[in-house]
């Protein structure tokens, strides 16, 4: 061992003293006063900001939601059972952010962006704030491009445009999620990235949805954000905002995205739970006063933005492209009561609603869409030309049928015109039925609607209408593939297409008996 003389030792000590960094680091630190039900009260965080992340020992984080005179109320994002009174809590100076980017596609993540599908870590390069301000009026563009759901009753009667917010509302177990999942499946190959946000659902239900999306090749363009029924209430109410941020990444880069919130009723219940635990005053149905703002600030973020907005956000990398985020929020009603607090709120925020009815579902009309109460306020201008032309008379036929069906229950003898309208309405109602996971192309839909409008179904038995439709689609695909391709590509409706549809249907009817 080398011997050091006393002068060298003193030199080394001097060097170490000179290198010593004694700059003080100011950190705002408080003490946990109480922990209960995922809510933490902290004393001493005078500089805490609303929505700021708070760090506890053991890398547990919370979010500030209450700013009181002598304490701060925060929700714990994770396992609050590890926290105790007297522990320290530190301000981070950051707001909640989640990972964003194309790396998330095909993955299942929790509301904080942590993967929960067992497929390894995420290699995302960017993060973005969960709470963001919606695009202003000047940066928006009118909705004029369709989102094809592949469902006849929606695309023909309640069309949805890119950048629209269309509410799906109805009682439990009548096919609300099925409509949303079919829409996601139908976006395959259409350049639309989908985000499915599951809020407060059973883990088995979420797993089943993911499995179905994988079976139909839809996970290749879908991100699933899952906050199960067993997850803490703060995670359930944050899930929607996290999913929205992930969808906005694509919107702000000139791409199209679709987000499904399944469902916002459970999000409102989770937010009510958090608010009551934070001792905020309850209002109607015990919801807090800002439950309208909870949903409005979320749904206003779904929009179609103009090319200038996209160019500005991408620093000039993307030019001349508009972006869109289309929202399909789902609301569950109790006993068909759409006048409850949360349903009326969301109806007033969205650009229309698809109303599902229990009676229709039980009588075999699936999807169980009530054409009279369902409406799309902006989708008409985004509808494909051929579907707009052929779909108008379908809605009219169904409206007249409902009116006459109610009247005919009391009338014993009906005149010929009324009887014909009733029979036509029965066939159109039957034609609007569609199996789950079997979305139709624009051309297939056009063929079905044309057959209904031009009276080709009038001599077909009501019970055989769907068999007739299946056989017709198979015939048109084999004999008139060019015509179907032309309709799918252009979406137009001219004399040539009309003549092609007419001759195809006439030939089909002449070769087969129904």
UniProtKB/Swiss-Prot annotation:
Q: Which cysteines are joined by disulfide bonds?
A: none
Question: Which keywords are on file for this protein?
Answer: ATP synthesis, ATP-binding, Cell inner membrane, Cell membrane, CF(1), Hydrogen ion transport, Ion transport, Membrane, Nucleotide-binding, Translocase, Transport
Q: Which HAMAP family match?
A: ATP_synth_alpha_bact (MF_01346)
Task: Look up the domain of life of the source.
Answer: Bacteria
Q: Does the keyword Calcium apply?
A: no
What GO terms fall under cellular component here? plasma membrane; proton-transporting ATP synthase complex
Site residues, Required for activity = 374
Q: How would you describe this protein's topology in the membrane?
A: Peripheral membrane protein
Name of the gene this protein is made from: atpA
Function text: Produces ATP from ADP in the presence of a proton gradient across the membrane. The alpha chain is a regulatory subunit.
**Which cell locations does it reside in?**
Cell inner membrane
Q: Top EC class per UniProt?
A: translocase
Q: What EC numbers are recorded for this enzyme? A: 7.1.2.2
Q: Which Gene3D superfamilies match?
A: 2.40.30.20, ATP synthase alpha/beta chain, C-terminal domain, P-loop containing nucleotide triphosphate hydrolases
Q: Which reaction does it catalyse?
A: ATP + H2O + 4 H(+)(in) = ADP + phosphate + 5 H(+)(out)
A Pfam family in this protein? ATP-synt_ab_N
Recorded hits in InterPro entries, A to Z, give: ATP_synth_asu-like_sf, ATP_synth_asu_C, ATP_synth_asu_C_sf, ATP_synth_F1_a_nt-bd_dom, ATP_synth_F1_asu, ATPase_a/bsu_AS, ATPase_F1/V1/A1_a/bsu_N, ATPase_F1/V1/A1_a/bsu_N_sf
- Give the record's subunit note: F-type ATPases have 2 components, CF(1) - the catalytic core - and CF(0) - the membrane proton channel. CF(1) has five subunits: alpha(3), beta(3), gamma(1), delta(1), epsilon(1). CF(0) has three main subunits: a(1), b(2) and c(9-12). The alpha and beta chains form an alternating ring which encloses part of the gamma chain. CF(1) is attached to CF(0) by a central stalk formed by the gamma and epsilon chains, while a peripheral stalk is formed by the delta and b chains.
- Please list the residues that bind ATP: 170-177
What is this protein's name? ATP synthase subunit alpha
Q: Does the keyword Lyase apply?
A: no
Family designation: Belongs to the ATPase alpha/beta chains family.
Q: Which residues form a coiled coil?
A: none
């Amino acid at each position: 061992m080398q011997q050091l003389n006393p002068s060298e030792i003193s030199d080394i000590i001097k060097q170490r003293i000179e290198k010593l960094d004694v700059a003080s680091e100011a950190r705002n630190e408080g003490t946990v006063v109480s922990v209960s039900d995922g809510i933490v009260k902290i004393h001493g965080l005078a500089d805490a900001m609303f929505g700021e992340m708070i760090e506890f020992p053991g890398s547990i984080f919370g979010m500030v939601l209450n700013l009181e005179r002598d304490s701060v109320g925060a929700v714990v994002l994770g396992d609050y059972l590890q926290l105790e009174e007297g522990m320290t809590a530190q301000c981070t100076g950051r707001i909640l952010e989640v990972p964003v980017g194309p790396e998330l596609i095909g993955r299942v993540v929790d509301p904080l962006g942590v993967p929960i599908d067992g497929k390894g870590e995420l290699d995302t390069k960017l993060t973005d704030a969960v709470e963001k301000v919606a695009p202003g009026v000047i940066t928006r563009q009118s909705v004029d491009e369709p989102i094809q759901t592949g469902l006849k009753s929606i695309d023909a009667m309640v069309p949805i445009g890119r950048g629209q917010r269309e509410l799906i509302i109805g009682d439990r177990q009548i096919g609300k999620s099925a409509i949303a999942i079919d829409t996601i499946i139908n976006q395959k190959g259409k350049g639309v990235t989908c985000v499915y946000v599951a809020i407060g659902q059973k883990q088995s239900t979420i797993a089943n949805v993911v499995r179905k999306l994988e079976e139909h090749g839809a996970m290749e363009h879908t991100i699933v954000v899952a906050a199960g029924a067993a997850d803490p209430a703060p995670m359930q109410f944050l899930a929607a905002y996290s999913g929205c941020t992930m969808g906005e990444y694509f919107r702000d880069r000139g791409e199209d995205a679709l987000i499904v919130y399944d469902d916002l009723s459970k999000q409102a219940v989770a937010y009510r739970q958090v608010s009551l635990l934070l001792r905020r005053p309850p209002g109607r149905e015990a919801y807090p006063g800002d439950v309208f703002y909870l949903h409005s600030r979320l749904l206003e973020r779904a929009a179609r933005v103009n090319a200038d907005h996209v160019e500005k956000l991408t620093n000039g990398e993307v030019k001349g492209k508009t972006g869109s985020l289309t929202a399909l929020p789902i609301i569950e009603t109790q006993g068909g009561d759409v006048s409850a607090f949360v349903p009326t709120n969301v109806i007033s925020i969205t650009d229309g609603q698809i109303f599902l009815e229990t009676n229709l579902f039980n009588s075999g009309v699936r999807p169980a869409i009530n054409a009279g109460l369902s409406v799309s306020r902006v989708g008409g201008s985004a509808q494909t030309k051929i579907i707009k032309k052929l779909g108008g008379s379908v809605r009219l036929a169904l409206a007249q049928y409902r009116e006459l069906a109610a009247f005919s229950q009391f009338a014993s003898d009906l005149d010929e015109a009324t009887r014909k309208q009733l029979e036509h309405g029965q066939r159109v109602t039957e034609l609007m039925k569609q199996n789950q996971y079997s979305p139709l192309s624009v051309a297939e839909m056009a063929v079905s609607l044309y057959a209904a409008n031009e009276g080709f179904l009038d001599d077909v038995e009501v019970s055989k209408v769907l068999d007739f439709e299946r056989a017709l689609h198979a015939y048109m695909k084999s004999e008139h593939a060019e015509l179907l391709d032309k309709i799918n590509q252009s979406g137009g409706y001219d004399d040539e297409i009309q003549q092609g549809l007419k001759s195809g249907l006439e030939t089909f009817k002449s070769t087969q008996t129904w």
